[in-house]
């Protein structure tokens, strides 16, 4: 049943953290939850070309700290910080203006190993009517060059305009969904084509996280030196 549950929600509190970190009583919780939703929708809509990977929100009294993980920090920051200032003003207007907003931009270290960015890339290519097999193969090759331990890509819908919808998936390497200490990055995106909506799901296995230790490196097989064969010596008996 490992495929029936969200891999990130399954590991919350073990190897994954919540994307919104704050506390509220039962009277203010719905309001703050709606604010988080508005913040995420506003950022994703206005920075759709910046390669947004993750948005984390923290709250302290009337202060909201927003951490944006992006593949293109220059697009978010803008010239002289004008982009961040415009984003902050827009968010304050959207939330009513009574919140103090601070924005921190974090660059994604490995773009080709991020499940969200891989899913967005595949969805964009499918909307341009590129063959799904070619797109998936390219995405997997790029992820392998980024040295991930394993990746699984699933595409569902009317693939290549087929009359009957189907689901196809490709996996390279290990993707242990039942292992709780496994660092699984998951993302889901939809591609709107002229034939209908295609669903794209990405699982990326980045290694195992053991408490108190660094990320476990895969065991390398011990290499034994090859024995050199001695060349046989033949006696010269031609004169006998």
UniProtKB/Swiss-Prot annotation:
GO cellular component assignments: cytosolic small ribosomal subunit
PROSITE patterns: KH_TYPE_2 (PS50823), RIBOSOMAL_S3 (PS00548)
KH type-2 domain: residues covered: 39-109
GO molecular function: mRNA binding; rRNA binding; structural constituent of ribosome
Region ranges (Disordered): 214-240
Keyword RNA-binding among record annotations: yes
Record keywords: Ribonucleoprotein, Ribosomal protein, RNA-binding, rRNA-binding
Family: Belongs to the universal ribosomal protein uS3 family.
PANTHER family xref list: 30S/40S RIBOSOMAL PROTEIN S3, SMALL RIBOSOMAL SUBUNIT PROTEIN US3C
Function: Binds the lower part of the 30S subunit head. Binds mRNA in the 70S ribosome, positioning it for translation.
Name recorded for this polypeptide: Small ribosomal subunit protein uS3
Species assigned in the record: Gloeothece citriformis (strain PCC 7424) (Cyanothece sp. (strain PCC 7424))
């Amino acid at each position: 049943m490992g495929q029936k549950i969200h891999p990130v929600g399954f590991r919350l509190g073990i190897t994954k953290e919540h994307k919104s970190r704050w506390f509220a009583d039962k009277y203010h919780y719905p309001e703050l939850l709606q604010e988080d939703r508005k913040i995420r929708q506003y950022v994703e809509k206005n920075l759709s070309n910046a390669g947004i990977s993750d948005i984390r929100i923290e709250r302290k009294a009337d202060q909201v700290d927003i951490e944006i993980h992006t593949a293109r920090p220059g697009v978010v920051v803008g010239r002289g910080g004008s982009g961040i200032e415009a984003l902050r003003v827009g968010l304050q207007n959207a939330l009513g203006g009574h919140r103090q907003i601070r924005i921190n931009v974090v660059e994604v270290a490995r773009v080709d190993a991020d499940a969200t960015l891989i899913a967005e890339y595949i969805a964009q290519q499918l909307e341009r009517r590129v063959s799904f097999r070619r797109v998936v193969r390219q995405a997997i090759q790029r992820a392998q060059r980024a040295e991930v331990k394993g990746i699984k890509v699933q595409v569902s819908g009317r693939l290549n305009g087929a009359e009957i919808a189907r689901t196809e998936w490709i996996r390279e390497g290990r993707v242990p969904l039942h292992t709780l200490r496994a660092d699984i990055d998951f993302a889901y995106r939809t591609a709107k084509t002229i034939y209908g909506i295609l669903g794209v799901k990405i699982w990326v296995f980045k290694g195992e996280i053991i408490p108190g230790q660094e990320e476990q490196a895969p065991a390398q097989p011990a290499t034994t030196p090859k024995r050199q064969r001695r060349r046989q010596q033949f006696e010269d008996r031609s004169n006998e």
